[in-house]
Amino acid sequence: MAAKKMHVKKDDMVMVIAGKEKGKTGKIMRVLPGKGRVVVENLNVVKRHTRPNRVNTQGGIVEKEAPLDASNVALVCSACNKPTRTGVRVLEDGTKTRFCKKCNETLDK
């Protein structure tokens, strides 16, 4: 399966717009473009029962973040602090940058 074009990147602040975590914000820890999913810090936490192994000698119940579908998150603009859609703009030097469609502010520094 081909990797999907992602509208968010690692370390972006996002807001969940659908699902049980709707309305919560967090920072993206990992992007999985092959599956079209993102892992957001301290959101969508699940419990996994693990056996003792070399890494985790104790075993037991471990809480970790599960991936969310990328379509369920919206990038939060740093200027207007609102979830927004993004556009791509080509600068004079030929580099591409993302911008907020609500306040027209550049998102990539």
UniProtKB/Swiss-Prot annotation:
GO BP field: translation
GO cellular component: ribonucleoprotein complex; ribosome
Keywords on record: Ribonucleoprotein, Ribosomal protein, RNA-binding, rRNA-binding
Gene3D superfamilies per UniProt: 2.30.30.30
Superkingdom classification of source: Bacteria
SUPFAM superfamilies listed in its UniProt record: Translation proteins SH3-like domain
UniProt entry tagged with the keyword rRNA-binding: yes
KW Zinc-finger (keyword) present: no
InterPro entries membership: KOW (IPR005824), Rib_uL2_dom2 (IPR014722), Ribosomal_uL24 (IPR003256), Ribosomal_uL24_CS (IPR005825), Ribosomal_uL24_KOW (IPR041988), Translation_prot_SH3-like_sf (IPR008991)
Record-linked Pfam families: KOW, ribosomal_L24
PANTHER family given in the database record: MITOCHONDRIAL RIBOSOMAL PROTEIN L24 (PTHR12903)
Family that this chain belongs to: Belongs to the universal ribosomal protein uL24 family.
Assembly description: Part of the 50S ribosomal subunit.
Biological role: One of two assembly initiator proteins, it binds directly to the 5'-end of the 23S rRNA, where it nucleates assembly of the 50S subunit.
UniProt-recorded name of the protein: Large ribosomal subunit protein uL24
